[in-house]
Amino acid sequence: MTSLPLGVKVEDSAFGKPAGGGSGQAPGAAAATAAAMGTDEEGAKPKVSPSLLPFSVEALMADHRKPGAKESSLAASESAQAAGGLAQPLGVPPGSLGAPDAPSSPRPLGHFSVGGLLKLPEDALVKAESPEKPERTPWMQSPRFSPPPARRLSPPACTLRKHKTNRKPRTPFTTAQLLALERKFRQKQYLSIAERAEFSSSLSLTETQVKIWFQNRRAKAKRLQEAELEKLKMAAKPMLPPAAFGLSFPLGGPAAVAAAAGASLYGASGPFQRAALPVAPVGLYTAHVGYSMYHLT
């Protein structure tokens, strides 16, 4: 309680009054007095060594070097709490502020670690490192949330056109029946009801079978007739020779053409007469001229 007024007096003497005036105390003496008072204040407080703090670097490093570090750290923490009045965290039992164990034993969770702050057990913070099967939560292990197994993609089945279930089987005609039917078809393609009934009874067939056979035979005859007509049309088309497109003669005929060519090429303008080139027979061009004139008209 005496240090506060003395400090105030020092300020008054050091800053409030000019040097060498008033109280008559020198500036050097005032500084010495202030230093002495500060020393008394520091001596009055209990000194706590940094190595005694449980969470200091020196205390943590000393645990790894000294075998009996746990007992010394506990004693140091209790003495530090008693001397300095350190506040203990709420909800923490006394004596739990000790330093961690030696490296030989697993380190307990500190109060400032993730497990200490979240109040989780040590096993919850250690992940399972099993390479065989990853750890799953209970809802993932439930078959309700598990993904369905992969299905193999099978090729789509080939869908064929199905006949009616009530379709009648095909009638197997004998050779004698087929010959009689062909003979009758050549005579008459359309049968009356009476003729069909009589003819079917003679062949031991039903009227429906004879009727369907004649219908199919008429369709086949029509297809054959159309194919024959197409062949005749292809054969009737004229095949023009290549010379018919490159030759063009005047209306005078081949003889006039040959005479005009000889007069223009071998005229009597020169002193020497040359022998005339052999002219092709007229009959060679007659067919071409007539053929081309036929198509031009």
UniProtKB/Swiss-Prot annotation:
Molecular function per GO: DNA-binding transcription factor activity, RNA polymerase II-specific; RNA polymerase II transcription regulatory region sequence-specific DNA binding; transcription cis-regulatory region binding
CDD domains the UniProt entry points to: homeodomain
Which GO biological process annotations does it have? embryonic morphogenesis; inner ear development; negative regulation of gene expression; negative regulation of odontoblast differentiation; nose development; positive regulation of cell cycle; positive regulation of odontogenesis; regulation of odontogenesis
Portion annotated as DNA-binding:
166-225
One of the Pfam families matching this protein, by short name: Homeodomain
Indicate where this protein is primarily found: nucleus
What is its subcellular localisation? Answer: Nucleus
Superkingdom, natural source: Eukaryota
Compositional bias of type Low complexity: which residue ranges? 26-38, 71-95
- Summarize what the UniProt record says about post-translational modification: Sumoylated by PIAS1, desumoylated by SENP1. Sumoylation of Lys-9 and Lys-127 not required for interaction with H1-5, transcriptional repression, inhibition of myoblast differentiation, or binding to gene promoters.
What residue spans carry the Basic and acidic residues bias annotation? 127-136
Assembly: Interacts with CREBBP/CBP, TBP and SP1; interaction with these transcription activators may inhibit autoinactivation. Interacts (via C-terminus) with PIAS1 (via N-terminus); the interaction is required for the localization of both proteins to the nuclear periphery and specific binding of MSX1 to the core enhancer region in target gene promoters. Interacts with H1-5.
The function of this protein is: Acts as a transcriptional repressor. Capable of transcription autoinactivation. Binds to the consensus sequence 5'-C/GTAAT-3' in downstream activin regulatory elements (DARE) in the gene promoter, thereby repressing the transcription of CGA/alpha-GSU and GNRHR. Represses transcription of myoblast differentiation factors. Binds to core enhancer regions in target gene promoters of myoblast differentiation factors with binding specificity facilitated by interaction with PIAS1.
**What name appears for this protein in its UniProt entry?**
Homeobox protein MSX-1
